[in-house]
A protein has these predicted regions:
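Proline-rich, low-complexity linker regions of envelope-associated factors in Gram-negative bacteria
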Residues: 24-106, 527
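Structural register within alpha-helical repeat arrays
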Residues: 118, 148-151, 184, 216, ...
Length: 625
């Protein structure tokens, strides 16, 4: 019985073990991959697998031809070298010749265009050595001239005086050449050039800076003309733009020629020009009393701490110094201290001799007067504007108009206003100002019940229809008549041909082709002045428009309009504007275009420091619809 039971158990265990082994084998041991038929293997090796046709599918002649070709491929014997399968040679790929999309330059060869592109790239990285080296390889010398021009105008460059001289003499005439000559003067030195060479240079190119004046003075002294040399050194020292090292150098050189009075005059010049850093460097060289005076002025100018202490240290004899009073006034106006500002203005001498620079004082007077108007203190405002000690310049014109406006609009005194507006009209020349003066004279005579003179001045103002006051004058003089702008001036055809042959015109096109038209601004302004009577302004504005720089065309036309030459086609560009955006009706085109012209001059890339962007100079948040 026991034996029988043992056999049964053994049989069951063996059976279970067999099932488990089979089960594990199926789970763990992967099934062997099926053997592929030789034909199918050849297909895989050859890289060709012929798909089977679906039953009932019609086979076209093209498909049969394809099948035959595939069958031939199938028969290719796969080579073996030392047991390694060598794949079939890949079919040759025929490359289609790409059509060149590079635009040809209008004036330059492909080779020169490439050199120009490289040179400008180096230039924008301030790698002047390589920029000039590459530019010199070009056959067109205008490429090198442009790169060298940009180099010489760059502050802190390493160019020598001879680099400047070579450029000036080779081009004869070029944009901003007066600036290049000014910078050339600052490269002169009796250490590197002989007195004779310097004198000869200034005989041909008169000095334009205080620095050049001093260098010439030194050369004259070394050549024996001591009196004239000392005179030039003293005069140049007052107004020269000097670095810290320049100041130390010239002070050592001219120690026996420069007096303490010369140092005071230079300090005064720097203070009136608001150059407080340069003034600070000068303080140590001043006499004690003047050192205290100009220390106080420097602290007031730079908005530094210790204003009251510095002013208290100024000697009594210098307390009423015009420059000190001016700086104190400016400091108070900036902080909104109206009444204490008036204390200064009403207690100084309103004479040119005392005020030294009445034009500087006017800037603060204007601000004070407008604040007084807001506070309805009209008589004080008139007093501030009318007693100004000015005798000429744009400041005088502004002072006369503001005085006349206050007299007419707030003091109700047209007779007093008339005198101011006439003086304003006689001291201006730009159409925008002439129309303004004429309109307000018309208004003044209208208030005086003098219809004849009123209409006369409105008619005069209506001559300038591109200005705001010109249009207001027209509405007064000819209320029922439409006004028309003058037509574009005629261009001399022969001159136009010579204009476009100008190498500098070629440079403008080159920069446009390189997408660097931002560098054309001063070039276009220069071209505009080439021959105004024959139409250079119009041609320059047209050229600017052709390269897509409406802003530069407007600038050229604006400058022309100041001299009563109106190129309205280019001064007021017209571009299409949508009627609706996102289902919302937008303002009429005339309003949009006028805003664009005023805000960005149609410069697509215009960005303001305040964050305004685009043609209309809108803040992104404001621009959202």
């Amino acid at each position: 019985m026991k034996k029988k039971s043992f056999k049964i158990c053994t049989t069951i265990i063996f059976f279970l073990f067999s099932i488990q082994s089979a089960f594990c084998e199926n789970l763990i041991t992967p099934k062997p991959k099926p053997n592929l038929a030789k034909e199918k293997k050849d297909k895989y090796i050859s890289g060709i697998i012929i798909p089977k046709f679906k039953p009932g599918t019609y086979v076209s002649e093209d498909q049969l031809e394809l099948l035959k070709e595939l069958e031939k491929e199938k028969e290719i014997v796969v080579k073996r070298v030392d047991g390694i399968i060598i794949p079939k040679n890949k079919p040759l790929i025929v490359h289609k010749k790409r059509l060149s999309t590079t635009k040809k330059s209008k004036y330059y060869s492909d080779r020169d265009l490439n050199y120009a592109r490289q040179a400008v790239a180096f230039m924008e990285k301030s790698n002047w050595k390589d920029a000039l080296k590459v530019a010199k390889k070009a056959r067109a010398k205008s490429i090198y001239n442009f790169i060298q021009w940009r180099h010489l105008l760059t502050p802190g460059n390493r160019a020598t005086f001879y680099d400047y001289k070579s450029f000036i003499e080779s081009v004869q005439t070029y944009p901003r050449l007066s600036r290049v000559k000014y910078l050339a003067e600052h490269k002169l030195s009796t250490k590197n050039q002989s007195p004779k060479e310097i004198i000869k240079w200034f005989e041909k190119h008169p000095y334009t800076s205080g620095f050049g004046e001093m260098v010439l003075g030194e050369s004259l002294i070394k050549s024996g003309n001591k009196q004239k040399g000392i005179q030039l050194i003293k005069k140049g020292f007052i107004r020269a733009d000097l670095t810290k090292s320049d100041l130390i150098n010239f002070r050592k050189k001219f120690k026996k020629y420069l007096t303490s009075e010369d140092y005071v005059k230079r300090a005064d010049h720097l203070a009136w020009e608001n150059k407080h850093w340069d003034l600070k460097r000068m303080l140590r060289y001043l006499p004690k009393d003047y050192q205290l005076l100009y220390t106080a002025r420097q602290i007031l100018m730079s908005n530094s701490y210790g204003v009251d202490t510095a002013i208290s240290k100024v000697p009594a004899k210098l307390k009423n110094d015009a420059g000190l009073n001016y700086n104190r006034l400016k400091w108070r106006v900036k902080r909104g201290r109206l009444d204490s500002s008036l204390d200064i203005l009403f207690n100084i001498k309103n004479t040119k001799e005392y005020m030294v620079r009445p034009d500087k004082w006017w800037g603060e007077r204007s601000k004070i007067a407008r604040k007084l108007i807001y506070k309805k203190r009209y008589e004080e405002a008139y007093k501030v504007t009318s007693k100004n000690a000015l005798s000429k310049g744009p400041e005088l014109a502004e002072a006369e108009w503001l005085s006349g406006w206050i007299a007419l609009s707030f003091l109700n005194d047209p007779i007093l206003a008339k005198d101011h507006f006439i003086k304003f009209y006689e001291n201006v020349s730009y159409p925008i100002s002439l129309s303004r003066g004429a309109y307000w004279l018309g208004r003044t005579y209208e208030k005086l019940k003098d219809k004849e003179n009123s209409k006369k001045w409105y008619v005069i103002g209506s001559k300038y229809l591109t200005t705001y006051y010109g249009q207001l004058s027209h509405m007064k003089a000819k209320p029922r008549e439409k006004f028309e702008l003058s037509e574009l001036m005629q261009i001399d055809k022969n001159y136009a041909e010579s204009f476009y042959r100008n190498k500098i015109v070629a440079t403008v096109h080159l920069l446009d082709e390189l997408n660097k038209d931002k560098y054309t601004k001063h070039i276009l302004r220069y071209l505009a002045n080439d021959n105004i009577d024959k139409g250079s302004e119009v041609l320059a504005a047209k050229l600017a428009t052709d390269i897509g720089r409406f802003d530069f065309a407007i600038q050229v036309s604006k400058i022309a309009s100041y001299q009563k030459r109106f190129h309205n086609k280019y001064n007021y560009p017209i571009i299409s504007t949508p009627n609706y955006i996102n289902g919302r009706k937008i303002p009429e085109s005339a309003l949009i275009l006028s805003i664009i012209r005023q805000e960005s001059e149609f410069d697509l890339k215009a960005n303001s420091h305040a964050g305004a962007k685009g043609l209309m100079q809108l803040i992104p948040y404001t621009a959202k619809l």
